[in-house]
């Protein structure tokens, strides 16, 4: 189990208090592209075309972390 897999497991167990930089690191490890056109949101796009937009404000709400985990593991977006 790699570092990003462990981070996903931690996110699944506790979806609170995550930063956008941590999500970007996991996305890089999983080969998921992201873009941040402004400062308020980041859009993650899975290679299968599924996407998820996450507000970049801290703390990130747990519902977005749950959706992010689902995007990384199953390729299911919004």
Model-derived regions: residue spans:
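Basic nucleic-acid-binding interfaces
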Residues: 2-36, 46-78
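Minor-groove-contacting beta-hairpin "wing" of winged helix-turn-helix DNA-binding domains
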Residues: 41-45
